Design a protein with these regions (language model features):
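Catalytic core of soluble alpha/beta enzymes
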Residues: 3-98, 120-121, 126-127
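Flexible C-terminal active-site loop/helix
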Residues: 86-179
């Protein structure tokens, strides 16, 4: 357990795992380090843990493949977890909220990013006394139409999904996808 400092941790202050290890050793616990990109962009998300490079982990449900993938990964992480969002819509935020609610213990979460949107596809999750009550947010058809992407962008996303889906659903890839 960490004593309260000016800030809780420095999130992903270095690009590579060797740099994180060096900084972690230099700081000798004076400032806790957290992995984010080293987890969600890695082919082996536990490598940063095995290297002893961090004191905490920031996880985002959507980039990891959803709440189940996040919870599976969490079983192998001996550090405090911060469940955060990847600038998700209120609908996308459902995944992070579900994962955070399912964890036996979770540190403070970074799930209040819905306020960064000027408009969302549904009513955003609202903080109540510093907490986000869990509810399933469903898209509003009128807002979906209003926010619809141009046809060429829609096509780009469809092609990306077709390209990435086989990678994400391959049995050897149970934690993360390179897409």
């Amino acid at each position: 357990m960490y004593k309260r400092q000016i800030f809780d941790y420095a999130e992903q202050p270095c690009h590579t795992i060797p740099e994180l290890v060096e900084l972690h050793d230099t700081l000798a616990g004076s400032i806790p380090l957290a992995a984010d990109e080293s987890i969600r962009r890695a082919t082996d998300p536990l490598r940063v843990i095995a290297a002893g490079a961090v004191d905490r982990v920031v996880v985002k449900a959507a980039p990891l493949g959803g709440p189940r993938a996040l919870l599976h990964l969490a079983e192998h992480i001996p550090y405090p977890l911060t469940v955060s969002s990847a600038l998700d819509s209120a609908v996308g935020m459902n995944a992070g909220l579900a994962a955070a609610a399912a964890l036996p213990a979770v540190a403070d979460c970074g799930l209040g990013t819905g306020s960064f949107f000027t408009v969302d596809v549904c009513e955003p999750h609202q903080l109540v006394d510093g907490h986000l009550p869990y509810r399933i947010a469903a898209p509003d058809p009128a807002r979906l139409e209003e926010l619809r992407a141009p046809a060429d962008r829609e096509q780009w996303w469809r092609e990306r999904l077709e390209r990435c889906y086989p990678l994400a659903t391959h049995p050897a890839n149970t934690v993360t996808s390179p897409c």
